[in-house]
């Protein structure tokens, strides 16, 4: 639940029931296009909708459209998941928001998956607001991610 806390446009702390994913997707012939993928408790439904969204990116759309909608509504009920599939890392510091454009939601980056000692490993970095999330929460989050990845890869 700690990853669902945000500060609203009036400075009040709120907790979202669910949060969606925004993710920049590489687009051939262009750099990227950011999509918003709605939360679904059922992974199969989430995956099907995510796949449909990612494969139906408009050719003439604004690559920053999802972020602009978030800024306009002033409600950051999302987390960002970016991928760097060609980069295996042991540490990554996220680009921080510019003055007047604070980072209002968790930022995550998934790196290149590689084989290590017979196991597939994938780096994952996260940037959060420490007012809401501490080390124990992050540890619990990573444990849940590991359990989910084991379950879907079995």
Task: Give the residues covered by each predicted segment.
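Flexible, Gly/Pro-enriched loop and linker segments at secondary-structure and domain junctions
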Residues: 77-119
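Anion-recognition interface
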Residues: 130
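A structural signal for short, well-ordered beta-strand segments
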Residues: 21-23, 108, 124-126
């Amino acid at each position: 639940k700690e990853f669902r806390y945000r500060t609203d446009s009036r400075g009040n702390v709120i907790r979202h029931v669910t949060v969606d994913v925004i993710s920049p997707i590489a687009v051939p012939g262009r750099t990227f296009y950011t999509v918003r993928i709605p939360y679904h408790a059922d992974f199969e439904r989430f995956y099907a909708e995510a796949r449909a969204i990612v494969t139906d990116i408009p050719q003439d759309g604004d690559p920053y459209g999802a972020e602009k909608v978030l800024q306009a509504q002033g409600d950051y009920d999302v987390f960002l998941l970016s991928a760097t599939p060609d980069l295996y890392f042991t540490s990554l510091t996220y680009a921080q928001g510019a003055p007047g454009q604070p980072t209002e939601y968790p930022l995550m980056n998934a790196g290149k998956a590689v084989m290590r000692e017979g196991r597939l490993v994938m780096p994952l970095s996260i940037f959060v607001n420490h007012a809401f999330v501490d080390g124990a929460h992050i540890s619990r989050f990573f444990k849940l991610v590991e359990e989910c990845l084991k379950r879907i890869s079995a």
